[in-house]
Curated annotation (Swiss-Prot):
Binds the lower part of the 30S subunit head. Binds mRNA in the 70S ribosome, positioning it for translation. The keyword Nucleus does not apply. GO terms for cellular component: cytosolic small ribosomal subunit. This is Small ribosomal subunit protein uS3. CDD domains: KH-II_30S_S3. It comes from Verminephrobacter eiseniae (strain EF01-2). Gene3D superfamilies: 3.30.300.20, Ribosomal protein S3, C-terminal domain (3.30.1140.32). SMART domains: KH. PROSITE patterns: KH_TYPE_2, RIBOSOMAL_S3.
Amino acid sequence: MGQKIHPTGFRLAVSRNWASRWYADNRDFAGMLAEDIKVREYLKTKLKNAAVSRILIERPAKNARITIYSARPGVVIGKKGEDIESLKKELAVRLGVPVAVNIEEVRKPEIDAKLIADSITQQLEKRIMFRRAMKRAMQNAMRLGAQGIKIMSSGRLNGIEIARCEWYREGRVPLHTLRADIDYGTSEAKTTYGVIGVKVWVYKGDTLGRNDLPAVETPRPDEERRPRGPRRDGRPGGDRSGAGRGPRRPAAGNSAPADGSDKPAGAGGADNTAVKRVRKVAAPAAPAADVKGE
């Protein structure tokens, strides 16, 4: 049974980049990675209502720089920047180094996989039907320029006793194409009857390199077909529709016989009378006459 590899990890260093960009020695790597995980969990809880798409953590020399991509940057900044200042102080205490926080706005949250998954889970927690939430998200994504989207929900859907998985897809989502810009996001809905997981794949086109380059829209196969041009040898051959042609001449050996039989008629006017060959067999010799008298 084929399994789906993580689209972001599959495309690292090809069309995607790492979410944590720093280098460390072997003895410091585990501690710094644990700090990154704790910082992401803290920001996920702190900025739950800010529609955070992703968090980029960079560590220059004895400093830290955190970039938060949010669809609602005003919620992160707060009134007169009060919230972001308190956020900087808290992150500096957790990391132990001075922290610079940058806020980047997500222009189209409808085609961001993480924000789509979070939106669906919020609707599921409000007891909205999962099919309605999934199809509405797919329609919005395709309307705003996505070339394909796939959404999968797993768990006790609608509160049934046996968990199952349902997915819907619109457009095309090429998971094996490395140059395809596939945005992938997951989220969990904590309902009264259990946890429901949501996965979202969004295909935005083909990229020329890293994800900071613009996506290239790939034409469909039916759009690539072009009308035929003139022949190289000068003979007319561009229009093959058959307009202006006369009636076709019957082939020499394919005309039906006049007698209505199913055998093809022979070419030319030769006599087609069948000749039956008979093999001559020698007659048996007569018995010798009896010369004795009576």
